[in-house]
Regions:
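Cysteine protease catalytic domains with a Cys-His-Asp triad
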Residues: 1-93, 99-104
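Contiguous terminal or domain-adjacent regions
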Residues: 158-194
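Residues that form generic nucleotide/phosphate-binding pockets
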Residues: 25-29, 121-124, 128, 189, ...
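Charge-rich, low-complexity amphipathic helices
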Residues: 49-52, 117, 174-178
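Cysteine protease-like catalytic core of ubiquitin/ubiquitin-like
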Residues: 65-168
Length: 194
C-alpha cells in the first residue's frame, strides 16, 4: 500500500492539490513500478527558455524517447498545469505515453481542447517514435468528467494510475463518467484525510 500523505491535518479534504502533493504520490508509484517514470508537474510553457538557455521544465524540453526505452521505461506519465510558469496555476491536465501499446493519451477532466504546448510535445514524441520505428496513436478525451472545482489534480493522478495498470484502453477509461465523488474517495485513501 502507498504511504499515506497526510498534511498534519492542515489541508482540507477538497483543497486544490499542489504540485508537491501530486509529485509525492507519483514518485511512490515510480518506486513501485520500474517500467514507469513520472515527469512534472510542469507549467504549460515547459519549453520556454528562461535563463542561461534552460527551459522551464528541462525533462520535457529535452525529452528523448530512445533514452527511456534504453532504460526499459515503457510508461511515462506527465502532469501539466494550464498556466505558464509565472502564474499561480489554474487547472491540472495529464498526458500518458504507453510505448508498448504505441499510444499517447491526453486527459483533461473538463474535456477541454488541448493546449498548443501539449500538442507540440505529443508531436515531438510521435516524431521521435517514428525515427525508432514506433507509430504512436495520439488520442485526446473530449468528455467532461469533472463538475466541481477542486479535483482536477486527483483526476490526473487517477488517470495515470489506471493507465499504468494497463488493464483497460484509453477509450474504455474515458467512456464511462468518472464522478467527482470517486475522486474525493481516492483523495481520502491517498492522503489519509480524517
Amino acid at each position: 500500500m502507498l504511504q499515506n500523505l497526510r498534511k498534519n491535518g492542515k489541508k482540507k479534504p477538497n483543497e486544490w492539490l499542489t504540485s508537491v502533493d501530486i509529485l509525492k504520490v507519483m514518485k511512490q508509484f515510480e518506486k513501485k513500478n520500474t517500467d514507469f517514470e513520472f515527469i512534472g508537474p510542469s507549467p504549460i510553457d515547459y519549453d520556454k527558455h528562461i535563463s542561461y538557455g534552460e527551459c522551464v521544465w528541462e525533462e520535457l524540453c529535452k525529452f528523448n524517447l530512445e533514452n527511456y526505452i534504453k532504460r526499459r521505461i515503457t510508461k511515462i506519465g506527465v502532469v501539466f498545469n494550464t498556466d505558464p510558469h509565472d502564474q499561480e496555476g489554474s487547472h491540472w491536465v495529464a498526458l500518458f505515453i504507453n510505448i508498448k501499446r504505441r499510444g499517447i493519451y491526453y486527459f483533461d477532466s473538463y474535456g477541454e481542447r488541448i493546449s498548443k504546448f501539449i500538442n507540440r510535445f505529443a508531436k515531438k514524441v510521435t516524431k521521435q517514435g517514428q525515427r525508432l520505428g514506433i507509430e504512436f496513436e495520439f488520442i485526446k478525451n473530449k468528455r467532461r468528467h469533472q463538475y466541481k472545482t477542486s479535483e482536477c489534480g486527483m483526476y490526473c493522478i487517477y488517470f495515470i494510475i489506471e493507465m499504468m495498470k494497463d488493464k483497460q484502453t484509453f477509450q474504455e477509461f474515458t467512456q464511462t463518467l468518472i464522478p467527482d465523488d470517486k475522486m474525493l474517495k481516492l483523495r481520502r485513501q491517498l492522503f489519509n484525510y480524517m
